[in-house]
Amino acid sequence: MGKRYFCDYCDRSFQDNLHNRKKHLNGLQHLKAKKVWYDMFRDAAAILLDEQNKRPCRKFLLTGQCDFGSNCRFSHMSERDLQELSIQVEEERRAREWLLDAPELPEGHLEDWLEKRAKRLSSAPSSRAEPIRTTVFQYPVGWPPVQELPPSLRAPPPGGWPLQPRVQWG
């Protein structure tokens, strides 16, 4: 039993020898599968350019199907599809330009930012115009009485939960 060659494009295997491999790699099924694979990674601008240069496929327009599929010499896109594709190309172009035109942020470190923030907060007046409001905990409407709630849904006690000195988790 000899080695076997597996073609990822066609999802099939065959006996690996020079004749069989050449025959497969030059075969129509392999070439179609390879084209479909690489077409998945084409950008919208290249697809739009190709589709605009093609004439509409009559069979696809009449029946909605074409025997040639993605290998057809004619376009299977409607005018609306072409418009949507051109809008997508324009948006991608704008996004690339925006990234190039956007000013780069200066390299900074967290420590520098924290120092500036501390200085800003210390220089700010300590008395604020608005007093700090504390929020009052309220249970949602329609819940059962507090005594019937499980501990995980009850409000924390006023001062927080007491610390347990020797608690083991696990």
From Swiss-Prot:
Region (Disordered): 150-170
Zinc fingers, C3H1-type class: 51-79
Keyword Zinc-finger: yes
UniProt KW keywords: Metal-binding, mRNA processing, mRNA splicing, Nucleus, Spliceosome, Zinc, Zinc-finger
SUPFAM superfamilies found in the cross-reference section: beta-beta-alpha zinc fingers, CCCH zinc finger
InterPro entries with a match to the protein in the record: U1-CZ_Znf_C2H2, Znf_C2H2_sf, Znf_CCCH, Znf_CCCH_sf
GO cellular component: nucleoplasm; U12-type spliceosomal complex
Keyword check for Acyltransferase: no
Assembly and binders: Component of the U11/U12 snRNPs that are part of the U12-type spliceosome. Not found in the major spliceosome.
Name assigned to this protein: Zinc finger matrin-type protein 5
Organism field: Homo sapiens
Lineage: Eukaryota, Metazoa, Chordata, Craniata, Vertebrata
